[in-house]
């Protein structure tokens, strides 16, 4: 079915397992895709890995679509020890899925192919007033700083700046402000100024994906959902939608 870099797959699974209890991977000739929402329906994750990103990728015979349903915590355990250079091979056999981790030793895991129901709108159309592309490591470190101060992070964008900040009790405050001259701010497009607040905990759940992404695209409007797009050098793409905080 396919062979992929085990370490990269591990980072994806680690993050997604904090959002979804079960995942349904859809495999077609174009590649692999997983979409799902958390039980509270606050966050949506969408993973797309094109067939060209795999070491090996094939569809058997005239099969056009294969569904792979799995418990995310179980899958997390399968790839838990994956290191850089390891490879993951996946073979789907109707009601079973064989995972082979090729490392110093060869590890095989045979798991049931679960029937997973995905209740996610097929097409979510959103327009955003502000879109900023930022170096991934800067976003990751900024959110970790924010967590030290409060539970809510505020994104604020103007014509020539992006601010990520939080205000906590006892006048604690932290802010990362990027301008168009900042090396970390790759691109900034602002139709009109926008400010919106989000739960830090939900954002932290996807920080693992930042390890495999060079940049993160942040899109938002005032009091509207936040869209984060993580782009990997191999062509993989992770989109994360998060509802604004009402607190």
Swiss-Prot record:
InterPro entries: DNA_clamp_sf (IPR046938), Pr_cel_nuc_antig (IPR000730), Pr_cel_nuc_antig_C (IPR022649), Pr_cel_nuc_antig_CS (IPR022659), Pr_cel_nuc_antig_N (IPR022648)
One Pfam family of this chain: PCNA_N
GO biological process per UniProt: leading strand elongation; regulation of DNA replication
Keywords: DNA replication, DNA-binding
GO molecular function, one term: DNA polymerase processivity factor activity
Superkingdom of the organism of origin: Archaea
Function: Sliding clamp subunit that acts as a moving platform for DNA processing. Responsible for tethering the catalytic subunit of DNA polymerase and other proteins to DNA during high-speed replication.
Family indicated by similarity: Belongs to the PCNA family.
Protein name: DNA polymerase sliding clamp 1
Upper lineage: Archaea, Thermoproteota, Thermoprotei, Desulfurococcales, Desulfurococcaceae
Name of the gene: pcn1
